Curated annotation (Swiss-Prot):
Organism per entry: Arabidopsis thaliana
InterPro entries (UniProt xref): Pentatricopeptide_rpt (IPR002885), TPR-like_helical_dom_sf (IPR011990)
Protein name in the entry: Pentatricopeptide repeat-containing protein At5g46100
Assigned protein family: Belongs to the PPR family. P subfamily.
The entry's keywords: Repeat
Keyword Repeat: yes
Amino acid sequence: MGSKVMMFKWSKNITPSQVIKLMRAEKDVEKSMAVFDSATAEYANGYVHDQSSFGYMVLRLVSANKFKAAEDLIVRMKIENCVVSEDILLSICRGYGRVHRPFDSLRVFHKMKDFDCDPSQKAYVTVLAILVEENQLNLAFKFYKNMREIGLPPTVASLNVLIKALCRNDGTVDAGLKIFLEMPKRGCDPDSYTYGTLISGLCRFGRIDEAKKLFTEMVEKDCAPTVVTYTSLINGLCGSKNVDEAMRYLEEMKSKGIEPNVFTYSSLMDGLCKDGRSLQAMELFEMMMARGCRPNMVTYTTLITGLCKEQKIQEAVELLDRMNLQGLKPDAGLYGKVISGFCAISKFREAANFLDEMILGGITPNRLTWNIHVKTSNEVVRGLCANYPSRAFTLYLSMRSRGISVEVETLESLVKCLCKKGEFQKAVQLVDEIVTDGCIPSKGTWKLLIGHTLDKTIVGEASDTLLRDLDI
């Protein structure tokens, strides 16, 4: 990373702490690097960076994801005979882990000896944790095996990471439990993290009774459960339809002064909504807000989905408004839930209003929600045909302009609507457009056209047009 040298009037007795202070004052990493470089320019009275100023600059570069510059800087440290500490090298490893580049973390780890740094237990555990976090489990197991082969003894930290790796898959959870049972024999007493990891793994694969037993053991051994432990258990209980028991754990954790987080509340709301208790989930939502815990996208999606499923559409709409006020933008999938909810209670005009709001707001369906959007749009048009034919036709035109295919049933509803109004020629034109788009009308549509004929000449001309388009 090149930087333009900034012209500072440095004092005669410049110190690394002064340089760090100036670098810290620069929010832009390139300007901070320019300060760093200027300190060693010719006019700077022979100042040489030490480990603290080098280390600070490496951290700044890593934080800005400028990894090449950070690695170049540690090479410069070595050239200038400045000791490259393990902590500086690990900061680069962690940075690569943060941006999901585990192989680069491993590469830097293997370069440690090039900088006269013999990796410690801490270094091994740090890289092992990165490999597990990035789901490089086979590599993690080999890495752990290498730790043991070079004579590094197991520690609580290293065994915790290994157990976490084993708890990622249903088939290896028992191996994780086996290591847990053997920990005391190896002089490693399980801690809160050990128990929490196992409880989370057991719950993930539906082994709730075992998780509860382990939780009880944890408390009996004065190993304090954390909010993560409680949340894992609550989520597991909700997933196995034991919502009331999960609610009791919520009360228990609050009584112990452990504040539930957004994931705790969202898990419970999901369980309540799936149990048909969306209003109770709303009460929990209000409690969550009162305690200063801000809901996230998952929270709102869970509640709105549950409310719409129980046809409590007004409550869902109010929640959507609150979501917007919080600065969270509903996606096409969430709008689709509300629109479908209105359709379920035959409020098609309101459904159309929300569809318009979604389109005007620039909210477009993605690959996953496109089919639902097509289905919902067609459903709204069909519903509008009975009492709001003009609105139905406007929405139909909007659908065509946005490339949304018109279903056969929707075409039939529109034709029926137009024929009922006596707009037969318009109905024929509509069918003509749809046929051109590649949609084949149903027998019902043909019968409607013929059945509502008032002028046989018009019918004959229209039929000829349609048959010609169909190449019959």
